[in-house]
Amino acid sequence: MAVQISKKRKFVADGIFKAELNEFLTRELAEDGYSGVEVRVTPTRTEIIILATRTQNVLGEKGRRIRELTAVVQKRFGFPEGSVELYAEKVATRGLCAIAQAESLRYKLLGGLAVRRACYGVLRFIMESGAKGCEVVVSGKLRGQRAKSMKFVDGLMIHSGDPVNYYVDTAVRHVLLRQGVLGIKVKIMLPWDPSGKIGPKKPLPDHVSIVEPKDEILPTTPISEQKGGKPEPPAMPQPVPTA
């Protein structure tokens, strides 16, 4: 018999499940360009879609790695046998995914690349991918013992109002270097896309669309229009009186 739980408890349980799942996959698939997870619950099973830039690494040789992840998720969250399925989906535009770019910057810094050069490289790649604007902040012991932060901005970025919720993609990551821990924050402002593939369908409130006027077709020959009732017959010529 199914246990009845209140809607409030169900929402909390779903939120905790997704947060724990996201944390686990972030730890396991950090090197494979992990960019997020979607959970779809159907009457028969639960489908978990893993978004990543390198899906082949997530799947593994002959699907071995995805089967291992499925077994771990099934055991950890107490799913019945065969009721959970994991899929790997490639991120459509890597340059518009804040998580993917934060991870990319993290590995650049771990590889010993200078902070300024690494940040400008990420900034350029994001803008070339079609973003409306972006902001990269790196904070920590960048030079010397005193901690400071460096901010790199390009394009347009909104900071307040409801459009921030669906126009700005944000990601925070931490990287442990020899001098200490650096914090990485990446914010990407997505472009307006009526199809909803690379950005939100809803335009910004201050967006103005200018409609091009239609070309007016000028008449080549003069046309007279008769308005009102029936046309009157032409007047008969009057005889000229003779003296």
Curated annotation (Swiss-Prot):
Positions bearing N-acetylalanine: A2
**PTM sites of type Phosphoserine:** S6, S35, S104, S209, S224
Q: Where is this cross-link: Glycyl lysine isopeptide (Lys-Gly) (interchain with G-Cter in SUMO2)?
A: K214, K230
List residues of cross-link (Glycyl lysine isopeptide (Lys-Gly) (interchain with G-Cter in ubiquitin)).
Answer: K90, K202, K214
Q: Which residues carry this modification: N6-succinyllysine?
A: K132
Supply the Pfam families for this chain: KH_2, Ribosomal_S3_C
Residues recorded as bearing Phosphothreonine in the entry: T42, T70, T220, T221, T242
Region of interest called Disordered, as start-end residue ranges on this chain: 200-243
Question: Which residue ranges traverse the bilayer?
Answer: none
Keyword Ribosomal protein annotated: yes
Entry keywords, A to Z: Acetylation, Apoptosis, Cell cycle, Cell division, Cytoplasm, Cytoskeleton, DNA damage, DNA repair, DNA-binding, Isopeptide bond, Lyase, Membrane, Methylation, Mitochondrion, Mitochondrion inner membrane, Mitosis, Nucleus, Phosphoprotein, Ribonucleoprotein, Ribosomal protein, RNA-binding, Transcription, Transcription regulation, Translation regulation, Ubl conjugation
EC number(s) per entry? 4.2.99.18
The UniProt similarity line reads: Belongs to the universal ribosomal protein uS3 family.
What's the protein name?
Answer: Small ribosomal subunit protein uS3
Q: Highest lineage ranks of the organism?
A: Eukaryota, Metazoa, Chordata, Craniata, Vertebrata
The record's gene field reads Rps3
